[in-house]
UniProtKB/Swiss-Prot annotation:
Name of the protein this chain belongs to: Zinc finger Y-chromosomal protein
Zn-finger segments (C2H2-type): 421-443, 452-474, 484-506, 515-538, 544-566, 572-595, 601-623, 629-652, 658-680, 686-709, 715-737, 743-766, 772-795
GO-annotated molecular function: DNA-binding transcription activator activity, RNA polymerase II-specific; DNA-binding transcription factor activity, RNA polymerase II-specific; RNA polymerase II cis-regulatory region sequence-specific DNA binding; sequence-specific DNA binding; zinc ion binding
Gene Ontology cellular-component annotations: chromatin; nucleolus; nucleoplasm; nucleus
GO biological process: fertilization; homeostasis of number of cells; multicellular organism growth; oocyte development; ovarian follicle development; parental behavior; positive regulation of transcription by RNA polymerase II; post-embryonic development
InterPro entries: Transcrp_activ_Zfx/Zfy-dom (IPR006794), Znf_C2H2_sf (IPR036236), Znf_C2H2_type (IPR013087)
Listed Pfam families: zf-C2H2 (PF00096), zf-H2C2_5 (PF13909), Zfx_Zfy_act (PF04704)
Function: Probable transcriptional activator. Binds to the consensus sequence 5'-AGGCCY-3'.
Amino acid sequence: MDEDEFELQPQEPNSFFDGIGADATHMDGDQIVVEIQEAVFVSNIVDSDITVHNFVPDDPDSVVIQDVVEDVVIEEDVQCSDILEEADVSENVIIPEQVLDSDVTEEVSLPHCTVPDDVLASDITSTSMSMPEHVLTSESMHVCDIGHVEHMVHDSVVEAEIITDPLTSDIVSEEVLVADCAPEAVIDASGISVDQQDNDKASCEDYLMISLDDAGKIEHDGSTGVTIDAESEMDPCKVDSTCPEVIKVYIFKADPGEDDLGGTVDIVESEPENDHGVELLDQNSSIRVPREKMVYMTVNDSQQEDEDLNVAEIADEVYMEVIVGEEDAAVAAAAAAVHEQQIDEDEMKTFVPIAWAAAYGNNSDGIENRNGTASALLHIDESAGLGRLAKQKPKKKRRPDSRQYQTAIIIGPDGHPLTVYPCMICGKKFKSRGFLKRHMKNHPEHLAKKKYHCTDCDYTTNKKISLHNHLESHKLTSKAEKAIECDECGKHFSHAGALFTHKMVHKEKGANKMHKCKFCEYETAEQGLLNRHLLAVHSKNFPHICVECGKGFRHPSELRKHMRIHTGEKPYQCQYCEYRSADSSNLKTHIKTKHSKEMPFKCDICLLTFSDTKEVQQHTLVHQESKTHQCLHCDHKSSNSSDLKRHVISVHTKDYPHKCEMCEKGFHRPSELKKHVAVHKGKKMHQCRHCDFKIADPFVLSRHILSVHTKDLPFRCKRCRKGFRQQNELKKHMKTHSGRKVYQCEYCEYSTTDASGFKRHVISIHTKDYPHRCEYCKKGFRRPSEKNQHIMRHHKEVGLP
């Protein structure tokens, strides 16, 4: 195909028409002349039998469509009759390309049709004439009784298919009929309504020239916008599997104080059925939805006060609009000569004002892109697209993606390109710094980030002086506080709480890491347990270790107080109000300050104090309501089994008579036992991480882990060299070497050197709380399963009964 030819493709019938609907057909000698008052575009016409020839780049107002037309009958207002039996119709139909704001006369040349001078058009007969297969008509025109089909004219475009049979009495008015007896070929064309007056043509600066990379056709319809059909040999959509972007250029009337407004805005993909922009059609007529980008600039006077450029809100401010398909990234050499500037071919697109092209004689040969295809000249209609833009709904903002945004360079009326300011976050470009600052409000997550960060802590600020003052506060910290250092990363902290929180980060990172002791073979998956092991086994200063954080203490009472930090327990409650405290000293301070009234009367059973004797008597009745538990060794009665246990331990045993019912720990005095019981109230059970052992007292749990789950036995007996994990176990063992029975039961012959074993003997044998007794040793148990386990362990040779 030659460079100046367009290949025509069959499409659905569109129309070319006489927009004014007047009498525009007359006889001119041997020719019938049809006048079309509006601009006509012809596009998307491809067929093996129909091609477009003689496209003259120097004269863009002419496009020649050649077709084999056998018979054409045109009548103005009367029926054709008395014509020769057969009339030949010219093969050439001359239709000019789009010309704006002017009346265009098209001639349909019929050199082979013989019409006498004295015969009117109404006398022409059509008995042996052939009709075309397709008729394209529009607006105020009417087609009636063509062949055997009746056709109605709709709104702006009417499609009619004519059967190519001989005509007998058919009438065609105000229309051009193109016939072809070959396979169907549809001329796809549409008109552009021009509402501007002739005086509008004075301003040539409002024209833009859009360069097309490939041979293409432009189709404009009043309701659907401009369509660019690029049909190159290599479709970019097919090669890259991605359609090029679509750029919408909006030109606004500028506020006198806002001369620099302009920029680029991304728009989401358009829906195919609602899109008024540019559609790129491949040869298979498959619609690919491109991305859209809106580039805007300003000219002359208007008022643009909106901060955010919203598609719906700016509809009233649109001055001109043109919708452009994506061009190649190169710039034509002729465009560079017009601009008298060297423009980078990899960065710019060709947007040349048509006024400049006119100044150079409308030489389309000199205005070509890299592929050598001629450029199409378009006029920016002031009224085009206003209704479409107003109907568009506000688009949702797209999240910024990682692709590179293309830059559209717009040459304004003054002949200079716009200067853009890119957003460093999403890549969008703006003409003024003011618009860029307004756009930055769409990135609040970046605005929320503060500039200055403290290297010693997590403090951040936007003010340098605030950071300086904060750093000074670190300098005031004592050296002792700064000595708190993380063992893993070396970071310093001002207090132990911050260090503990920081270590939790390392704990999560090294969850599967095994920690080994440097001094023995002990290893554990938790750093806290390793720290506890080091302090308890290899250090004599802090033998009591917290199982949660690994902190060591000299005394067990300190460990108990510390554990309340992790559990949040407040075992000490005020007896006069709802105040609770984790420390008994704080409770005493509360009572002295809040309840300063003297309470000299005390209950003998629970040691509660009261302000008068009546309150004590009422309180004593509570203890005397039910005493069903009788002691076997005396006449003492208790209201519950716990009181009975305490009675047996305190009265009928000699060592630590006051024993805790939860952990079986004994005390010398009831007051000590009461303080100890308060620790268990409201306290959760602590689970050993290595076995199923559970206990409410964290101190006992720590002792359990040290004694059971450590491999080393640092405490050795000097006599038998037996090893023990704890020092108290060694002390118990040393009593066995003395040969002396320390604890003797008053009710039986049982004796032992182990105080805890003696307590268990008294409770299990000499109380009724253990109803299930062993048949061999009379030891009592709470449940039958415990008794059976005891028999299997200690009386295995006898077996179960």
